[in-house]
Structures are given as structure tokens and as C-alpha cells.
Regions:
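Short beta-strand/loop motif that positions the catalytic acidic residue
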Residues: 368-370
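Short glycine-enriched nucleophile-adjacent loop
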Residues: 168-179
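N-terminal cap/lid subdomain of alpha/beta-hydrolase-fold enzymes
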Residues: 56-128, 135-138, 165, 207-209, ...
């Protein structure tokens, strides 16, 4: 063989090696159609491939997605869908999953132009509202499975979804609207009960502002109100929580009265009768003219902000978190306005159905967590949803066969600072493995480990309605949360609009 021939063979071998990740590029491109535009195909580590694709199911819809596909030799057979956060508009980093051998997909929920791009701050048109509410995640998944079939020549063995806040809502929506998409879903601090959570924000704003929109409390006063419950309960709470966090922040009315008297002693400026009335309203929530519960009220100890304290929460956030369609609240939103603007449209973005029968029937499993210090997606609305779900499905025992809820003490939302943990910082591979064990082997998670670094502890959180505590003998024990501790919002706030 001549030198020229030898060189040609070597170059051909190098080219083949360099393009091995693209061996099925032609097959991948066959997935493109009138809805799916393939924007880019490229390499990831260890001979893997990424595909950037945009979905446009109707005019005005532009859903950006990415899937990362490990090499056939490394693929675990699993697809993981990854949730977004806030209002979406970005593609998150998927390396942690694809490097572990999983096919993994995510989406910007179709909101990039309105959240990060040339239309930033503009009202969402109906097509984008629909994408964000339910369509983007489903279509991302449909096409992700097509890319998997094209790349590997076979379907995924199992499909899982994980997400928190907005991503948790995505997971709920998948289980409720598209139960065939995923076998197991891990939804932490889900922003799912959007209308009910929006009511909490409206109530907090109304209690902390006058009718002109003027703030009635200082930041220091609200910080005192957020921190006082820990000191108030330190001699009566159970181990290991006493003096650090609340084991159970669902205070009955008499306990709230005692707390407010304690707050007045802590900060005499909060002894004013009008401020006392408003602080009680923060915790006791609101009812309509017929006596129906609009919202439970914020939990004592709810944290938001760094280093901590209860925030004012703006009426602007009310509209942004639920509507994002040009609707805005007045300076002092009334409950009539809430009904008109949030309830009327909120069913489209709610992910709070009490019918998970199709998901459960096909063997789907849903693991949910919520945080006692979460002021952004308040725990009472999630607990209320789960209690309604249990009543609809024959009790907690039956419901726990397909859906388990784990309330986490000391957990705050992203952007805040929880006394034990914040947002997804508490979600580890151990939780994903627990979901996998439940789906594939039928071994349901009996605990949700919550790391408490400050005390060098890991709390073995049991599924609701149980809670864990340390006995005097130093061993973990469980007890049931009190019945009827939640002032459950009216069921109509949990309704989902049909597609």
C-alpha cells in the first residue's frame, strides 16, 4: 500500500471515529415534520448526541427543546424529562443526567421570546399561554420518544419526570392530562394549585397593604412575624425541631392568638390592634360571603428572602404567577376581582385534578413534596389537594398505592432561605432511585430523606399524614398529624379546564 493510500485509510478511519456520534443523524432528521423543526445536532461527552428542536403546533407557538442521547453502549434505557422553573424561557443543563447514561429532555415551555427575548415583558398570546400551561411538556415528550426510537432503534424501557416549582406543575400536568407519557414522576414544591396559591398571595397583599397600596408593615416587622413562631414553640415542640424549626406549623386559632400576643411582646410596635387584626388575617386566611374557604392563610414560620423573613409579595406577582396574559390587579385587589381575573382563567393553568385514575391504572407513580416554610407555593394548598385526593380514592392507604406526599419541615422555595433546606437542594439521587424502585419493583418509598447539615442529621420524613420526631430514647418515631388541621380552599379552586 502506498503512502498516499495509507494516509487516505487513516483519514477515513479518523473521520468515521469523529462522526460516530452522528451515525444515525439521517434517522434523527426523519423525526422532523410540520410541527418539529430540527435546529441542531451535535456531540456531547462519550460519543453522545444532542438535538435542539423547536415545536410549533400552531401559529405563534415556538417551543424550544433539547434532548441529549448517550451512546447506545451507555444508554440505561431510561428517558428523563426535566422540568423548568419560574416562567420558563430557558434550556437547563442536562449533563447530570446524560452523563449517567440516561436520555434526557427539557423545554423552555415556549416562553423564551416573552421572558428573555425580543418580546420580554409583553403579554403572552393564547398560543404561548397554552404552551406554558400544558402543551410544551407533552409535545417535548412525544418527540423525545421519537428521537430515542430513531437513535437506538427501539423505545425507552422506562420514562421518568422530575421537576420543582414550575417543573413540579409540569409533572402534575403530565400525570393528570397525559398519563401515558411517564411511568414515574417526582414533583417537589409543585406550583400546581395555581388559583388556590394565588389566593394566598392576594390575601397576604391585602393584609399587609392599605387600599391605596401602601405597605403597613416594615420589613423588620414581617421578619419578626416570620421568626417568632420558632421561639414561641421552642419549649413545647418535639425533638429535633424545637428551637430551630416548626414540626407542625398548622396552628389552630387559639394558638395563633397566643402567637400574636407573643409577637407583641417581642416587638411592641406590633401590639397595635389594627396590625394584630391584619397579622391574624395573614395566618387565618379568608372566606367568601357564603363562608367558603378562599385560602388557608400563610403558615407560621413561612420564609422568603435572604437571610429570611416574610416578604410582602406584590400584586404584580399575583398576575405573573397565574395569568401572564395582560391581566393585572388593582392597587388593592378585591376578592371579586380575584374571582373575575384568576378563577376565570386559572383552570387552564391549574394542575390539581382529583382524577389520577388513568395514571394509576397504568402503574404510574407520583412522589410529591412540599415545604413548611414555602411562601411561594404554600403547603396548605398542596396538603388540601392531597386530602381531597385521598377522599376521592378511598383513603390515604389506597391513595398511597400510586401517590405519596412528603411534607418537609424547614424547607423554603427557591429564592428564599429555608431553615433546613431550600428548593431542589433537598432532591438527591436517593429520591430518584426511590422513585425508580417504586415503579420497577413495586417497593414504595417509606421515607423521604431530608438532610439537615447544621445538625448533622438526615430526617426520615414519612408520607403524609405521618410525621417523624426523635423520642427521648434517641430513636426516630412517627405520629399522625392532627385531623382537620387544614382550612381547605373550596374545591372549585382546584378545577382544571378541559383541553
Amino acid at each position: 500500500m502506498s503512502i498516499r493510500q495509507t494516509l487516505a485509510v487513516a483519514l477515513a478511519a479518523m473521520a468515521l471515529s469523529a462522526s460516530s456520534a452522528f451515525a444515525d443523524e439521517a434517522a434523527i432528521r426523519t423525526v422532523g415534520d410540520g410541527v418539529c423543526r430540527i435546529d441542531k445536532i451535535g456531540k456531547i461527552a462519550e460519543e453522545g448526541v444532542f438535538v435542539d428542536y423547536t415545536l410549533s403546533p400552531e401559529a405563534g407557538s415556538e417551543i424550544r427543546c433539547r434532548i441529549e442521547l448517550p451512546s447506545a453502549e451507555r444508554w440505561t434505557g431510561e428517558l428523563w424529562g426535566i422540568g423548568s422553573s419560574s416562567q420558563g424561557g430557558f434550556i437547563g443543563n442536562l449533563t447530570a443526567y446524560s452523563s449517567g447514561g440516561h436520555a434526557v429532555a427539557t423545554t423552555d415551555l415556549g416562553t423564551y421570546r416573552y421572558e428573555k427575548g425580543d418580546l420580554r415583558g409583553k403579554p403572552w398570546p393564547d398560543a404561548v399561554f397554552k404552551d406554558y400551561s400544558w402543551r410544551a411538556t407533552h409535545l417535548m415528550t412525544v418527540y423525545a420518544k421519537r428521537f430515542i426510537k430513531a437513535q437506538y432503534g427501539k423505545r425507552e424501557r422506562r420514562s421518568y419526570f422530575v421537576g420543582g416549582s414550575c417543573g413540579g406543575r409540569q409533572g402534575f400536568c403530565e400525570a393528570m392530562r397525559f398519563p401515558e407519557d411517564y411511568d414515574g414522576i417526582l414533583a417537589y414544591i409543585p406550583a400546581s394549585m395555581m388559583v388556590a396559591a394565588n389566593a394566598q398571595v392576594v390575601n397576604l397583599y391585602r393584609q399587609t397593604h392599605d387600599e391605596t397600596g401602601k405597605a403597613l408593615f416594615t420589613t423588620n416587622q414581617l421578619a419578626c412575624l416570620a421568626d417568632a413562631p420558632i421561639a414561641y414553640m421552642k419549649d413545647r415542640d418535639v425533638k429535633p425541631y424545637a428551637g430551630s424549626v416548626l414540626s407542625n406549623p398548622f396552628f389552630p386559632e387559639a394558638e395563633i392568638d397566643g402567637l400574636l400576643a407573643f409577637v407583641a411582646r417581642q416587638d411592641p410596635s406590633l401590639s397595635d390592634p389594627e396590625l394584630q387584626k391584619r397579622m391574624k388575617g395573614i395566618f387565618m386566611g379568608a372566606r367568601d360571603a357564603k363562608g367558603r374557604v378562599i385560602c388557608h392563610g400563610m403558615l407560621p414560620g413561612a420564609h422568603h428572602g435572604n437571610p429570611g423573613g416574610m416578604s410582602f409579595r406584590s400584586k404584580g406577582l399575583c398576575a405573573a404567577s397565574v395569568l401572564r396574559n395582560g391581566v393585572s390587579y388593582s392597587a388593592y385587589p378585591s376578592w371579586e376581582e380575584f374571582e373575575e381575573k384568576a378563577v376565570a382563567r386559572g383552570g387552564e393553568i391549574n394542575a390539581s385534578s382529583l382524577d389520577l385514575s388513568a395514571f394509576a391504572k397504568r402503574g404510574g407513580k407520583l412522589v410529591v413534596s412540599c415545604g413548611w416554610e414555602d411562601q411561594t407555593t404554600p403547603a396548605p394548598e398542596i396538603i388540601a389537594w392531597y386530602e381531597y385526593l385521598a377522599e376521592r380514592n378511598g383513603g390515604f392507604g389506597k391513595t398511597q398505592e400510586f401517590c405519596r406526599l412528603f411534607p418537609l419541615p424547614g424547607l423554603a422555595h427557591g429564592g428564599g432561605k429555608g431553615r433546613i433546606a431550600t428548593s431542589g437542594g433537598s432532591v438527591k439521587e436517593v429520591h430518584r432511585n426511590a422513585l425508580r424502585q417504586w415503579v420497577e419493583k413495586g417497593i414504595a418509598p417509606e421515607t423521604y430523606p431530608l438532610a439537615w447539615p447544621a445538625k448533622n442529621l438526615t430526617l426520615p420524613i414519612p408520607p403524609y399524614p405521618l410525621q417523624c420526631y426523635l423520642g427521648d430514647d434517641g430513636k426516630w418515631k412517627t405520629r399522625r398529624y392532627p385531623k382537620c388541621m387544614v382550612r381547605r380552599p373550596d374545591l372549585r379552586y382546584y378545577e382544571m379546564a378541559p383541553l
